[in-house]
Amino acid sequence: IPIYSRLIEEDRPEAAGRFAGAIFGLLLAAAGGVALLGVVFAEPIVTVLAPGFLDDAARVSAGTLPFNRFDLAVRTVRIIFPMAGVLVLSAWALGVLNSHRRFFVPYVAPTLWNAAIIATLFGGGYVLAGTPGAPDALSSDALTQLLLIACVGAFGGGLLQFGVQLP
Protein backbone atom coordinates (compact mmCIF):
# COMPACT_ATOMS: atom_id res chain seq x y z
CA ILE A 1 0.00 0.00 0.00
CA PRO A 2 2.80 2.53 0.67
CA ILE A 3 4.16 2.03 -2.86
CA TYR A 4 0.67 2.33 -4.36
CA SER A 5 -0.01 5.48 -2.31
CA ARG A 6 3.29 7.01 -3.42
CA LEU A 7 2.45 6.35 -7.08
CA ILE A 8 -0.93 8.04 -6.59
CA GLU A 9 0.72 11.03 -4.86
CA GLU A 10 3.23 11.30 -7.72
CA ASP A 11 0.27 11.52 -10.13
CA ARG A 12 1.17 8.27 -11.86
CA PRO A 13 -2.25 6.59 -12.05
CA GLU A 14 -1.27 4.16 -14.83
CA ALA A 15 1.71 2.85 -12.86
CA ALA A 16 -0.41 2.70 -9.70
CA GLY A 17 -3.08 0.74 -11.56
CA ARG A 18 -0.54 -1.73 -12.92
CA PHE A 19 0.99 -2.14 -9.47
CA ALA A 20 -2.41 -2.67 -7.80
CA GLY A 21 -3.34 -5.15 -10.52
CA ALA A 22 -0.11 -7.07 -10.05
CA ILE A 23 -0.61 -7.23 -6.29
CA PHE A 24 -4.21 -8.34 -6.81
CA GLY A 25 -3.02 -11.10 -9.14
CA LEU A 26 -0.47 -12.30 -6.59
CA LEU A 27 -3.03 -12.24 -3.78
CA LEU A 28 -5.59 -14.01 -5.96
CA ALA A 29 -3.09 -16.74 -6.81
CA ALA A 30 -1.90 -17.13 -3.21
CA ALA A 31 -5.33 -16.96 -1.57
CA GLY A 32 -6.86 -19.13 -4.28
CA GLY A 33 -4.07 -21.67 -3.89
CA VAL A 34 -4.44 -21.81 -0.12
CA ALA A 35 -8.23 -22.06 -0.45
CA LEU A 36 -7.87 -24.90 -2.95
CA LEU A 37 -5.43 -26.69 -0.64
CA GLY A 38 -7.88 -26.25 2.23
CA VAL A 39 -10.71 -27.75 0.20
CA VAL A 40 -8.62 -30.65 -1.09
CA PHE A 41 -6.91 -31.40 2.21
CA ALA A 42 -9.85 -30.69 4.53
CA GLU A 43 -9.83 -34.22 5.95
CA PRO A 44 -6.14 -34.19 6.98
CA ILE A 45 -6.56 -30.67 8.38
CA VAL A 46 -9.47 -31.77 10.56
CA THR A 47 -7.59 -34.93 11.53
CA VAL A 48 -4.70 -32.83 12.85
CA LEU A 49 -6.83 -30.13 14.49
CA ALA A 50 -9.59 -32.36 15.89
CA PRO A 51 -8.23 -35.90 16.36
CA GLY A 52 -11.02 -36.64 18.83
CA PHE A 53 -13.50 -36.58 15.94
CA LEU A 54 -11.91 -39.53 14.12
CA ASP A 55 -14.02 -42.23 15.75
CA ASP A 56 -17.31 -40.37 15.29
CA ALA A 57 -18.60 -42.65 12.50
CA ALA A 58 -18.37 -45.66 14.80
CA ARG A 59 -19.94 -43.74 17.68
CA VAL A 60 -22.84 -42.58 15.50
CA SER A 61 -23.39 -46.18 14.34
CA ALA A 62 -23.36 -47.35 17.97
CA GLY A 63 -25.89 -44.68 18.89
CA THR A 64 -23.63 -42.90 21.39
CA LEU A 65 -23.25 -39.75 19.31
CA PRO A 66 -26.07 -37.94 17.47
CA PHE A 67 -23.99 -36.80 14.46
CA ASN A 68 -20.57 -37.20 12.90
CA ARG A 69 -18.51 -34.19 13.99
CA PHE A 70 -15.60 -35.18 11.73
CA ASP A 71 -17.75 -35.07 8.59
CA LEU A 72 -19.32 -31.79 9.70
CA ALA A 73 -15.93 -30.22 10.38
CA VAL A 74 -14.65 -31.31 6.97
CA ARG A 75 -17.70 -29.79 5.27
CA THR A 76 -17.28 -26.49 7.13
CA VAL A 77 -13.54 -26.32 6.35
CA ARG A 78 -14.39 -26.73 2.66
CA ILE A 79 -16.63 -23.67 2.85
CA ILE A 80 -14.55 -21.51 5.18
CA PHE A 81 -11.19 -21.78 3.37
CA PRO A 82 -12.56 -20.15 0.18
CA MET A 83 -14.30 -17.53 2.33
CA ALA A 84 -10.96 -16.63 3.90
CA GLY A 85 -9.50 -16.19 0.42
CA VAL A 86 -12.27 -13.77 -0.50
CA LEU A 87 -11.60 -11.81 2.69
CA VAL A 88 -7.93 -11.47 1.68
CA LEU A 89 -9.06 -9.88 -1.58
CA SER A 90 -11.41 -7.64 0.39
CA ALA A 91 -8.45 -6.41 2.44
CA TRP A 92 -6.66 -5.56 -0.83
CA ALA A 93 -9.68 -3.48 -1.90
CA LEU A 94 -9.72 -1.75 1.49
CA GLY A 95 -6.08 -0.75 1.08
CA VAL A 96 -6.60 0.59 -2.43
CA LEU A 97 -9.65 2.61 -1.39
CA ASN A 98 -7.85 3.98 1.68
CA SER A 99 -5.01 5.13 -0.59
CA HIS A 100 -7.58 7.23 -2.42
CA ARG A 101 -8.85 8.57 0.92
CA ARG A 102 -12.13 6.71 0.56
CA PHE A 103 -12.83 5.37 4.00
CA PHE A 104 -16.58 4.92 4.33
CA VAL A 105 -17.20 1.93 2.04
CA PRO A 106 -14.21 -0.17 3.19
CA TYR A 107 -15.16 0.18 6.82
CA VAL A 108 -18.88 -0.37 6.30
CA ALA A 109 -18.36 -3.34 3.95
CA PRO A 110 -17.70 -5.83 6.80
CA THR A 111 -21.21 -5.15 8.09
CA LEU A 112 -22.48 -6.88 4.94
CA TRP A 113 -20.47 -9.96 5.93
CA ASN A 114 -22.04 -9.91 9.39
CA ALA A 115 -25.50 -9.17 8.03
CA ALA A 116 -25.27 -12.09 5.60
CA ILE A 117 -24.36 -14.47 8.42
CA ILE A 118 -27.17 -13.17 10.63
CA ALA A 119 -29.71 -13.25 7.79
CA THR A 120 -28.85 -16.81 6.84
CA LEU A 121 -29.05 -17.90 10.48
CA PHE A 122 -32.47 -16.30 10.94
CA GLY A 123 -33.72 -17.49 7.57
CA GLY A 124 -32.33 -20.98 8.00
CA GLY A 125 -33.63 -21.21 11.56
CA TYR A 126 -37.07 -20.12 10.43
CA VAL A 127 -37.16 -22.61 7.57
CA LEU A 128 -35.84 -25.46 9.72
CA ALA A 129 -37.88 -24.76 12.88
CA GLY A 130 -40.88 -23.04 11.36
CA THR A 131 -40.65 -20.42 14.11
CA PRO A 132 -38.18 -17.57 14.33
CA GLY A 133 -36.07 -17.50 17.48
CA ALA A 134 -36.90 -21.03 18.63
CA PRO A 135 -33.58 -22.93 18.64
CA ASP A 136 -34.97 -25.48 21.10
CA ALA A 137 -37.31 -26.61 18.33
CA LEU A 138 -34.38 -27.69 16.17
CA SER A 139 -33.24 -31.29 15.99
CA SER A 140 -29.59 -32.29 15.91
CA ASP A 141 -29.82 -32.69 12.12
CA ALA A 142 -31.39 -29.25 11.79
CA LEU A 143 -28.66 -27.68 13.92
CA THR A 144 -26.07 -29.33 11.69
CA GLN A 145 -27.83 -27.89 8.64
CA LEU A 146 -27.98 -24.50 10.34
CA LEU A 147 -24.22 -24.52 10.91
CA LEU A 148 -23.65 -25.25 7.23
CA ILE A 149 -26.14 -22.53 6.30
CA ALA A 150 -24.18 -20.08 8.48
CA CYS A 151 -20.95 -21.07 6.71
CA VAL A 152 -22.53 -20.48 3.31
CA GLY A 153 -23.86 -17.15 4.61
CA ALA A 154 -20.35 -16.23 5.74
CA PHE A 155 -18.97 -17.07 2.30
CA GLY A 156 -21.72 -15.06 0.61
CA GLY A 157 -21.13 -12.19 3.01
CA GLY A 158 -17.44 -12.24 2.17
CA LEU A 159 -18.32 -11.97 -1.51
CA LEU A 160 -20.60 -9.01 -0.71
CA GLN A 161 -17.90 -7.37 1.39
CA PHE A 162 -15.43 -7.66 -1.46
CA GLY A 163 -17.90 -6.83 -4.22
CA VAL A 164 -19.10 -3.50 -2.81
CA GLN A 165 -15.51 -2.25 -2.66
CA LEU A 166 -14.79 -2.83 -6.33
CA PRO A 167 -14.81 0.25 -8.56
Task: Cite the ranges covered by each PLM segment.
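Membrane-embedded alpha-helical bundles of multi-pass transporters/translocases
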Residues: 1-167
